[in-house]
Amino acid sequence: MATVKSDIEIARAAKKLPIIEIGAKLGIPAEDLAPYGHDKAKIGAQFIAALKDKPDGKLILVTAINPTPAGEGKTTTTVGLGDGLNRIGKKAIVCVREASLGPCFGVKGGAAGGGYAQVIPMEDINLHFTGDFHAVTSAHNLLAALIDNHIYWGNEENIDVRRITWRRAMDMNDRALRDIVASLGGVANGYPREGGFDITVASEVMAILCLASDLKDLEKRLGDIIIGYRRDRTPVYARDLKADGAMAVLLKDAMQPNLVQTLENNPALVHGGPFANIAHGCNSVIATRTALKLADYVVTEAGFGADLGAEKFFDIKCRKAGLAPDAAVIVATVRALKMNGGVKKDDLGQENVEALVKGCANLGRHLANVRKFGVPVVVAINHFVSDTNAEIEAVKNYVARLGAEAILCRHWAEGSAGIEELAYKVVELAESGQAKFQPLYPDNLPLLEKIEIVASKIYHAGEVTADKAVRDQLRSWEDQGYGYLPVCMAKTQYSFSTDPNVRGAPEGHIVQVREVRLSAGAGFVVVITGEIMTMPGLPKAPAAERIFLNDQGYIEGLF
């Protein structure tokens, strides 16, 4: 029996083209690329600006059912579909997010696709890449430093230290930093106050980077960040502290999309990386818009299940950027459907058609939800070797009864050859003219009503609960002119409910709103539900324990 190669072994054996050649495939002159080595480059701002009058290609969203902790291969399917479209003669670009060090060293061990459907250089993308996350972290913490410095030197803006909302950021899972006391150690260190850290991918600066249309818009949004409140309860903005210019300088290069390639030497833009459970979960607007000008088809993903990533892609990213998707793909795996049907993790490798059919209710809910946005949809069954024919047919039959099609995809094992059928179906849907995209709710509804619409229509909740402080805060923001903003729900990715242990398609559950945060620069209100954390912790046996350099100096353990 042949040994199955690991993702990193496959990536390392790939025959990469020089990044200048990948750019040439898209018509990008060498002088408009800023190479980082030979296999990655940033696309110049002037080249991007010159594309504005070109027609747009078709936009395809890849989303998924509620995942198992290991993920269901959404990025793998996104990359595979991009390769598949190129294989059948279409000019396609993949747009995905950059990987965070937190989950890389925590649970996932990497996030650049898998098997024979990866973006490369895999090690670089998963680690420091082109430094974008470091730039975001630096800009975020520069603002934090300027806040405490302003207070130290007299507090001219009369900031109420009890009402500072801006926390610090770090691209790592570190529960010890969730709540801290800063400025201890005496007068020379400033005024002690409570604070904390969020993971960089939950930072408003990351969201701003991913939603800004250009450098001018970036600086304006950075200035709009509310860092806290004065004693008279009026908001203090980043521009009040003269932070916006310096923050924009730190982010100047990070704003430019990163060009890399797939294993099959097709172009991919990897840019931005907000989480979908605690942020809006989509790659950058500037990368997506650039790709739409350069290709006939753009395949992008939104994080976690369609209840989180897809809803935010539609209601936040598309609304803000004026994008209209032409088709959607929902990735499902037999193992995740069985888990949603009540099968324990250790038993997922055994055939269980009965549990699978029960778990298909989760897939059916996601299918119905995507259709609510007016986007035609197809299901991709991401094949695992443990899947049986009976299980695969059960999924296909279930989806057919809902008036859609489920297509078995073997891109992980076979690359683009294993996903041709899905590629043809996506072209058919995208060219059909069926797409009549519309967000779930209009801008002019009250914020609480927007929360209730997402909870009832997407999660099928029976009730939204929020205490008086939360309701008063939402009304206060409406009075300040922020009522038109969309809501960004922070919720567990493992369930439609706020309880990660409730699988399937629960009905009538309660969504408890614990906290709300105004991201005035990004342009949305974050709604924190259940026990979700904006600074994750590491698991008992983190992936970091299995990552090392071998005797040849190569990285092992990324997967």
Curated annotation (Swiss-Prot):
InterPro entries in alphabetical order = Formate_THF_ligase, Formate_THF_ligase_CS, P-loop_NTPase
Pathway(s) of this molecule: One-carbon metabolism; tetrahydrofolate interconversion
Tell me which SUPFAM superfamilies the record gives: P-loop containing nucleoside triphosphate hydrolases
**Per UniProt, which keywords does this protein have?**
ATP-binding, Ligase, Nucleotide-binding, One-carbon metabolism
Q: Which GO terms describe its biological process?
A: tetrahydrofolate interconversion
Keyword field contains Nucleotide-binding: yes
Q: What is its EC number?
A: 6.3.4.3
What residue ranges are annotated as transmembrane?
A: none
Enzyme class, top EC level, equals: ligase
Record-linked PROSITE patterns: FTHFS_1, FTHFS_2
The residues that hold ATP are 68-75
Molecular function in Gene Ontology: ATP binding; formate-tetrahydrofolate ligase activity
Q: Which reaction does it catalyse?
A: (6S)-5,6,7,8-tetrahydrofolate + formate + ATP = (6R)-10-formyltetrahydrofolate + ADP + phosphate
NCBIfam families to which the protein is assigned, alphabetical: PRK13505.1
- Hey, which family's this protein in? Belongs to the formate--tetrahydrofolate ligase family.
Q: What is this protein called?
A: Formate--tetrahydrofolate ligase
Species classification = Bacteria, Pseudomonadati, Pseudomonadota, Alphaproteobacteria, Hyphomicrobiales
